[in-house]
Each structure stands twice: as C-alpha cells, then as structure tokens.
Amino acid sequence: SGGPPPGDFRDWDEADWHRAVQNNMVAHILLIKAVIDGMIARRFGRIVNITSAAVKAPYPALGLSNGARAGLTGFVAGLARQVAKHGVTINNLLPGSHETDRLRAIIARQGEQEGIPFEDAIAKAKAAEVSGRFGTVDEFGAICAFLCSAHTGYITGQNLLVDGGYYHGTL
C-alpha cells in the first residue's frame, strides 16, 4: 500500500488513525514478535523496517504516516539494543523520494492542487531533489540487501536515510 493517504488531519476520523497505526506500526511489531525468538536461538537475524524520511523531517500532508512511523521507530530503538547481544540487528530504512506508485500519486495530487499538468509536477519535484532525480527501487533494494547481510552485525538500532541527500541536517 505504501502508507496512509495524505491530507488534512481534520479530515481523518478515529478509524483512519487506528488503521494507520495498525498498518505502519503494530503490523511490523507483530511480525518482529513472530520471528525474533528464532533469530535469537540461531544467534543471527536481520530485521529491516521500511519507514519514511518523514521520521526525521515530517511532511506536512502526511500526518497519519508521520505519527505511526515515528512510533515504530521509537519501539525499534529500544528493542534493537535488547537483542543485539544475540547477533540480531534491527534497523530502519527511511526512504525519501523513490520512483513508486505512491510517489506518483502524491505528486499527481500536488499537481492538481497547484493546477499544473502531471509532467510539470514531476519535473518540479525532481528539481527539488539534491540530485535532480528520484531514487530507484533497485538502489533502495541494494541498500536493504546490504543491511540484511552478515557484514552488518555491528549496525543496529539505526535509522538510515535513503533520500539522495534531501535531508539537510547533520544529526
């Protein structure tokens, strides 16, 4: 699904909030719960949650996503430190703008709001990126595969931005 819909928080009802938290926080936690003991027993495991760059720099129209994903990030920060001594790592990937259906839908909505054609909205969004382009799913997949490898046993509890340098902070 890619995440909850963008919008104004005043338009979301309680069910929208519960759905966002269920799909973007609780579901991840339940999956972790289902596999963590086996990983601990084997003394090896890699868990990578795909959240959002909005965890570091929330997007104004993505309040449902911002809140739910920040909750998951907080939970993982503590759990990763509990299981690290068992050879299990848990990290979060925080994607920025990658060429996905979700990004295209968000840009289409922005274009409609601004009264500009979709192609112009895409060009405007790419121009706002540091690299002048969006990330590819192949690039993102390679980073995820690396975090799942045996080479990353000393990386845990981290939030890795994969945003092409869009986030300007240093911490």
Residue ranges and their predicted role:
Residues 117-118, 129-140, 151:
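A conserved structural motif in NAD(P)-dependent oxidoreductases
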Residues 48-71, 76-85, 97-98:
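Catalytic loop of short-chain dehydrogenase/reductase
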Residues 57, 145, 156-171:
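Short C-terminal tail/terminal secondary-structure segment
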Residues 37, 81-82, 153:
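Alpha-helical segment proximal to the catalytic Tyr-Lys
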Residues 32-33, 77:
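A short, exposed helix-loop element centered on a Lys and neighboring polar residues
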